[in-house]
Amino acid sequence: MTVEPARAPSLYAALAAGRPVDVEVSGVAADSLGARRVGEIAFAMATASPPISLLVDDEEILRARDLMWRDYRIAAEAGAATAYAALTGGAYRPEPNERVALIVCGANTDPATLR
């Protein structure tokens, strides 16, 4: 499964078009997840099995980043909080007894912005 910011949807748009396409990029996670076009190799890997591609908005990303700080003391950048935003915002709802793992990486956050 992939999760992207709604304002930087390079894979989501490529899946909809059936091929990599250029997209406009902006938003809180653009500096880390703001590829204008998904690469050919990434697109091929994403389409090798039935893809699930989700979008989350900036407000959900910032809320998830703040929750990660408040609940776990993880100082994540917006891009790293995007997958967590899908879980906390409801874009992704795990099946009963499903195990979900998130990889959180990135060091591009200003601690002064954490709430």
Residue ranges and their predicted role:
Residues G39-N97:
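Active-site-adjacent helical/loop segments in soluble small-molecule enzymes
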